[in-house]
C-alpha cells in the first residue's frame, strides 16, 4: 500500500512546533521575527513570543532559521 507522504514544509514546521524550538523568521521585506511556532496551516504560521502571538502569512516568509538542530524523522540524529 502507498503511504500518504507529507511535504517537507509541513514536516519541518510540525517538528519545530512539537519540540518547541525557537526560530528566527526573515520576511521578504527584511523584517526579522523570533518565536516559537504554536500552529500552522496551508497559508500562515502562528508565532508566539513573550506571551504574544503573531500570525505570519507564509507568502511573506523568505527564510526560517531554527536556533538548534531539528530532528524531523524518528531515529534521526539532529
From Swiss-Prot:
InterPro entries: Hfq (IPR005001), LSM_dom_sf (IPR010920), Sm (IPR047575). It holds the Pfam family Hfq. Residues 10-70 form the Sm domain. Disruption phenotype: Cells show increased sensitivity to hydrogen peroxide and decreased survival at pH 4.0 during stationary phase growth. It is less able to withstand prolonged starvation. It fails to replicate in cultured murine macrophages and is completely cleared from spleens and livers of infected mice 10 weeks after infection. The keyword RNA-binding applies. Keywords: RNA-binding, Stress response, Virulence. It comes from the Bacteria. GO terms for molecular function: RNA binding. GO terms for cellular component: cytosol. One of its GO terms (biological process) is regulation of RNA stability. Signal peptide: none annotated. RNA chaperone that binds small regulatory RNA (sRNAs) and mRNAs to facilitate mRNA translational regulation in response to envelope stress, environmental stress and changes in metabolite concentrations. Also binds with high specificity to tRNAs. Contributes to long-term survival under nutrient deprivation, to stationary phase-dependent hydrogen peroxide and acid stress resistance and is required for prolonged survival in the intracellular environment of the host macrophage. Belongs to the Hfq family. HAMAP family: Hfq (MF_00436). PANTHER family: RNA-BINDING PROTEIN HFQ. This is RNA-binding protein Hfq.
Amino acid at each position: 500500500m502507498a503511504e500518504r507522504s507529507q511535504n517537507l514544509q509541513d514536516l519541518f514546521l510540525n517538528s519545530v512546533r512539537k519540540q518547541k524550538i525557537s526560530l528566527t523568521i526573515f520576511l521578504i521585506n527584511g523584517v526579522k521575527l523570533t518565536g516559537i511556532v504554536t500552529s500552522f496551516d496551508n497559508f500562515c504560521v502562528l508565532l508566539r513570543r513573550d506571551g504574544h502571538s503573531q500570525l505570519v502569512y507564509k507568502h511573506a516568509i523568505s527564510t526560517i532559521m531554527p536556533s538548534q538542530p531539528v530532528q524531523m524523522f524518528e531515529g534521526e540524529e539532529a
